C-alpha cells in the first residue's frame, strides 16, 4: 500500500478557495486575511477585498474591521469614509475594541457628521476593553478640555 501523499500548499489553498466559493464564510475570512497580509500566499489586495467582503457580509467581526480599514485607508480600494464607518460600527457592535476606537475617531473627524457624545462613549468602551490607544485619546481629550 502506497503511503498517503501530503497535499501541497497549492492544493490546500485550492481546497480552501473551493470551500469559500461554496459559501463558507469562515474560509472566506481566512482567505481574506491570508491575501491581505500575504501570509502563505503572495499579497493580493483585490482578492483580500473580495474574500473579506463575503465574510463581513456574513457577520465576521474581524473581517468587518479589516475591510473597514481598507476603505478608510484606501488600501486595495478607493477610500470611502462612510463605508469604513459602517464596517467599523458593525465590528464595534461585536465588541472589537480597535473598531470601537476607529468609530470614535471617524465621529470626531472633520467633515464627518460629528457626534461627540457617541464618540466619547465608543472611546470609553474601547478603553474599558483594554485598548491603550483609546485610553490615550481619552486622556488627551480630557487634557484639552474636550473629554468631560
Segments from the language model and where they lie:
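Short helix-capping/linker turns of helical repeat alpha-solenoids
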Residues: 22-25, 37-39, 57-60, 73-75, ...
Amino acid at each position: 500500500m502506497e503511503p498517503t501523499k501530503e497535499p501541497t500548499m497549492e492544493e490546500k489553498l485550492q481546497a480552501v478557495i473551493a470551500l469559500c466559493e461554496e459559501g463558507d464564510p469562515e474560509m472566506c475570512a481566512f482567505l481574506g486575511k491570508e491575501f491581505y497580509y500575504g501570509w502563505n500566499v503572495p499579497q493580493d489586495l483585490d482578492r483580500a477585498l473580495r474574500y473579506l467582503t463575503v465574510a463581513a457580509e456574513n457577520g465576521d467581526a474581524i473581517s468587518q474591521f479589516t475591510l473597514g480599514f481598507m476603505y478608510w485607508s484606501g488600501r486595495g480600494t478607493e477610500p470611502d469614509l462612510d463605508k469604513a464607518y459602517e464596517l467599523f460600527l458593525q465590528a464595534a457592535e461585536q465588541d472589537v475594541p480597535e473598531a470601537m476606537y476607529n468609530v470614535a475617531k471617524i465621529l470626531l473627524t472633520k467633515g464627518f457628521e460629528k457626534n461627540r457624545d457617541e464618540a466619547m462613549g465608543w472611546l470609553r468602551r474601547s478603553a474599558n476593553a483594554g485598548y491603550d490607544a483609546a485610553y490615550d485619546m481619552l486622556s488627551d481629550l480630557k487634557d484639552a478640555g474636550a473629554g468631560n
